[in-house]
Regions:
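Contiguous, well-ordered alpha-helical segments that form the cores/surfaces of helical PPI scaffolds
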Residues: 104-108
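Short, glycine-rich nucleotide/cofactor-binding loops
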Residues: 93-103
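Nucleotide-activated chemistry modules centered on ATP-dependent adenylation/adenylyltransferase
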Residues: 2-94, 109, 113-434
Length: 434
């Protein structure tokens, strides 16, 4: 487990995780309860609680972004990282990066504001877009940092994908496992005691913690939230075709490996009022970060590096939860006051209809099926197996798109063609011309 600060009382991490089961099962068998402010309800996978007025825990925690003294919290961050400067060799910290605009913000803060010398690490999704490839190279070039890239064998990656799709109905697990463990392995191997992440998704969406808790990444939170309680070791159980040595990349370091490393993983969002949209747009303007239209949403910054996330993964999310990634984006925008709840409802309905009428990203799903060597029928069978048979959706009529909604959607930067125009995945590609 990554080291966390010790207190004399129950640590925030433990306090939050004690109620994991209760939160995760909260909506099961209960009447549907929707937040009075955002679009989330009590079926949220991270779990939501509601106050007496019907406001969800995610909205309550988000309110801290306007109530906390963030200048003071930045000072706390500066004090926190000071002991790590030059303490163990060349690198002060490890930073996991992806090819999206907000990772420019992470580097801008860590290197330009805090004065740390980071080692960048990036785990290859195998589904890279040209936009993502270009952003990743631009990050390395702009901030003049060393970077370690981890690319698994395509054959092994596909074997892991088949296992997680058949066992958990997930196409995102292989990347999440690698993305969350590769930085820890590098930190242990290179004796770098600090890992810096942008934000903690359960806190940003469902208010799992207060920013005052200053929660840190641990093995347990990764297991519960990122990996759906399914570890790399589970991949080789039963009738799996995978061998032990093929899943080592996805396995968390052992307690013995971690014992002497004293590695901790912190989230910048505990010290900065994290706003993915605002920060991304600042980075587009300041450093030339790239943005592109994604299927299924108006957001041109989130996961523009991954052709499967906003297509196949989004289709699975809709099947499993009844809503797509666009709801996450809309809830964020409601909370920041950039769209009204009524307009968000209308916009979500329009995307739901578009998803239904286009066959649920059928072109992009077929691209994935061809890559993995499976049929659409086999995929649908797995969806039925994991999430129940799909019934015909009854969609409420989408409201006519108003000029205000059109302006809202067009307010997002577009510096490259839509990622859906790309006809093949890039494993390793050329990002910059020199």
């Amino acid at each position: 487990m990554l080291a966390t600060k010790q207190t004399s009382t129950l640590a925030p991490e433990a306090a939050g995780l004690q109620s994991i089961a209760a939160r995760a099962t909260q909506g099961i068998g209960q009447p549907l309860q929707q937040c009075r402010a955002c679009l989330y309800d009590n079926r949220h996978p991270f779990g939501l609680t509601f106050d007496d007025t019907g406001l969800c825990s995610g909205c309550t925690t988000h309110a801290e972004k306007t109530s906390l003294d963030w200048a003071a919290r930045l000072g706390m961050l500066e004090k926190l990282v000071q002991p790590y400067k030059g303490c163990k060799g060349n690198y002060d910290c490890v930073i996991p990066v992806r090819g999206t605009a907000e990772y420019f913000k992470v580097l801008d803060v860590v290197k330009n504001q805090l004065g740390l010398n980071p080692l960048l690490v990036s785990f290859n999704s195998h589904f890279n877009s040209q936009t993502g490839i270009q952003n990743l190279d631009l990050i390395r070039d702009t901030f003049d940092c060393d970077i370690l890239l981890k690319t698994q064998s395509p054959t092994v990656y596909k074997k892991i994908m088949r296992e997680t799709l058949s066992r958990r109905g997930s196409v995102h697990w292989p990347f999440l496992a690698g993305h969350t463990v590769w930085p820890v392995r590098v930190a242990v191997q290179h004796d770098i005691p600090l890992i810096i992440w942008p934000f903690h998704q359960p806190t940003e969406q469902s208010g799992m913690f207060s920013y005052l808790d200053e929660n840190e990444m641990t093995r347990r939170s990764r297991h519960e939230y990122d990996l759906m309680q399914f570890e790399a070791e589970d991949l080789v159980s039963g009738e799996s075709l995978l061998r032990d040595e093929e899943v080592l990349t996805s396995a968390y370091p052992s307690d013995r490996e971690l014992a002497g490393a004293s590695v901790r993983g912190i989230y910048l969002a505990n010290y900065l009022p994290w706003d993915t949209r605002q920060y991304s747009e600042e980075m587009v303007s300041k450093f030339g970060a790239q943005a592109a239209e994604c299927p299924g949403t108006f957001d041109t910054y989130d996961h523009v590096d991954n052709l499967v996330y906003m297509s196949v993964h989004d289709a699975i999310k809709r099947r499993k939860l009844g809503y797509g990634r666009v709801r996450d984006h809309l809830c964020r925008e409601i909370r920041f006051g950039r769209i009204s709840r009524d307009d968000a409802v209308a916009l979500e309905a329009s995307y739901a209809k578009a998803f239904a009428y286009t066959g649920g990203h059928s072109k992009l799903k077929q691209q994935f099926f061809d890559w993995l060597g499976m049929t659409a029928q086999a995929f649908e069978w797995l969806m039925d197996y994991h999430f129940g048979r799909l019934h015909q959706l009854t969609l409420s009529p989408a409201l006519a798109t108003t000029s205000a909604l059109s302006a809202f959607q067009e307010g997002y930067e577009r510096t490259r063609p839509p990622i859906a125009d790309q006809d093949k995945y890039i494993i390793i590609g050329k990002g910059l011309s020199v």
